[in-house]
Regions:
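A generic structural signal for solvent-exposed, polar alpha-helical segments
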Residues: 10-11, 31, 222
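Generic detector of short, locally flexible boundary/turn motifs and exposed helical patches
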Residues: 1-7, 25-31, 131-138, 179-182
Length: 252
């Protein structure tokens, strides 16, 4: 069972953005049209979430940060998808990901910066810190999936929480980072409105999910009546070929 503090506290209307499986998230409906800056840490080869978001919000700016997505990795991914599609005759649409990348990120609204997100600036490693990214930004929707590096930037997220309307974040290896998570949840003023297991990561030695996807919403967007003792999260299976994970929480 997961610790009690990890479960959702408020019930709000949610909309699914992005892929049906991995790469998609449930987010508060009311936040989408109010967002001025969509900032995403971690992109990979799936930007369906970002594309969906910009469909519903015609005016917000998008900046993504991912140092692993380069021209070389995109071309390599293209040939891998081509081989897979020809051999197994499945998912032919993935062949066009390379073209889709250039069409989407070379427009006037969407920018992909090849930087690694960290706590400090390190030019040699192309690492950029959150102060440089979030400073002077308002009405922020923040999405984070950076494979355990999220724990290095939690203090900076707290620093800019007043300007964040919504945070969607993947917490990896939660069993090893419960103290950090508990500290973050106590200091972070945004409230958890949805928690989902990521079944791609599997279970730990206590049969708890290793990774959770959490959606936080700013307090200004809900009422006291929205607080509920037990909330059933909206979730979709990340990996349809792996066993579904059901979340259960301790009472205290």
């Amino acid at each position: 069972m997961l610790s009690y503090f990890l479960q959702p506290k408020v019930s709000v209307k949610l909309r699914r953005l992005g892929s049906k499986n991995d790469g998609g998230y449930f987010v508060p409906k009311k936040i989408i049209p109010l967002t001025e800056n969509l900032i995403c840490f971690g992109l990979g080869f799936n930007w369906d979430f970002e594309k969906d978001f910009l469909k519903y919000n015609k005016f917000c700016k998008l900046i993504t940060y991912d140092h692993t997505v380069t021209y070389f990795s995109l071309i390599k991914n293209f040939f891998q998808n081509l081989f897979f599609s020809i051999r197994y005759r499945k998912e032919p649409e993935k062949i066009f990901k390379l073209i889709d990348y250039f069409l989407f990120f070379y427009g006037y609204r969407a920018i992909h910066k090849k930087n690694k997100i960290g706590y400090t600036n390190i030019k040699k490693q192309k690492q950029i810190d959150l102060d440089k990214v979030l400073k002077n930004k308002k009405k922020i929707f923040l999405k984070i999936d950076i494979e355990s590096d999220e724990y290095k930037i939690l203090d900076k997220i707290i620093k800019y929480q007043k300007d964040i309307l919504c945070l969607v974040i993947e917490f990896h290896k939660i069993g090893d980072n419960l103290k950090k998570l508990k500290k973050f949840y106590k200091k972070f003023k945004l409230v958890n409105c949805n928690t989902c297991p990521n079944n791609s990561s599997g279970l730990d030695n206590k049969n708890n999910t290793k990774t959770i996807e959490v959606t936080f919403i700013n307090k200004i967007f809900f009422k006291k009546d929205d607080y509920q003792k037990k909330i059933v999260s909206k979730c979709s299976i990340n990996n349809p070929y792996k066993k579904k994970i059901i979340l259960n929480y301790n009472k205290s």
